[in-house]
Amino acid sequence: MTYETILVERDQRVGIITLNRPQALNALNSQVMNEVTSAATELDDDPDIGAIIITGSAKAFAAGADIKEMADLTFADAFTADFFATWGKLAAVRTPTIAAVAGYALGGGCELAMMCDVLIAADTAKFGQPEIKLGVLPGMGGSQRLTRAIGKAKAMDLILTGRTMDAAEAERSGLVSRVVPADDLLTEARATATTISQMSASAARMAKEAVNRAFESSLSEGLLYERRLFHSAFATEDQSEGMAAFIEKRAPQFTHR
């Protein structure tokens, strides 16, 4: 499939989606949203892909939603079109996803990064939800995912003031998985994605599902759900291979079945 606002690359078992609207600091208009979602879904459906990286440019991962596109919307327009609903499909991708963030990740850009399972930030990254400065509030999950990631007090601080935080503060707050020098960002993201992609695909998807369930259920429900997924893993060929390889002191050869 041909895309106009993103670049898509396959590198062995890793899929890489690069936002490519440099003239607009990768602002997320409807076309970008649709293309990112379409590419992620396509990669998710590919059995030869075991991890997906989403990244932007050195200056901006994504500087937010495209304000020019939204400025003249009425309530009826936004509500009827269910604006931003497209991103729900991206969040539902089962393949592990990695956000590789350099530069600005603001508003929708921060929300896009938070939809990913692992968030690796360059030391140049800046995060924030500045929507309040425009007379609105986060609409792509910012108020929900940010609060779950860094807690109510910190989320309130960022959302109500619209201020940004640098990569170091984001790491201390628990928003990002790790911070690396900007020149090493894609190397680190590719290495992490390659490591994940070499694991059993079914086990990786189950693990992702179990962790996500922790935010959506009580502890007892989450423990039961995890246990059922653990039991299910014993129906896979990869479980037999993984445990046999451990006993035989060799590297496992997963077939993702």
UniProtKB/Swiss-Prot annotation:
Group of enzyme by EC: lyase
Catalytic activity: a (3S)-3-hydroxyacyl-CoA = a (2E)-enoyl-CoA + H2O; a 4-saturated-(3S)-3-hydroxyacyl-CoA = a (3E)-enoyl-CoA + H2O
GO MF, one example: enoyl-CoA hydratase activity
Entry-linked InterPro entries: ClpP/crotonase-like_dom_sf (IPR029045), Enoyl-CoA_hyd/isom_CS (IPR018376), Enoyl-CoA_hydra/iso (IPR001753), Enoyl-CoA_hydra_C (IPR014748)
Sorted UniProt keywords: Fatty acid metabolism, Lipid metabolism, Lyase
Biological process terms in GO annotation: fatty acid beta-oxidation
The protein's Enzyme Commission number: 4.2.1.17
Record-level GO cellular component terms: peptidoglycan-based cell wall; plasma membrane
The keyword Metal-binding belongs to this UniProt entry's keyword annotation: no
Domain of life: Bacteria
Role of this protein: Could possibly oxidize fatty acids using specific components.
Protein family according to the UniProt entry: Belongs to the enoyl-CoA hydratase/isomerase family.
Name of this chain's protein: Probable enoyl-CoA hydratase EchA8
Organism: Mycobacterium tuberculosis (strain ATCC 25618 / H37Rv)
The encoding gene: echA8
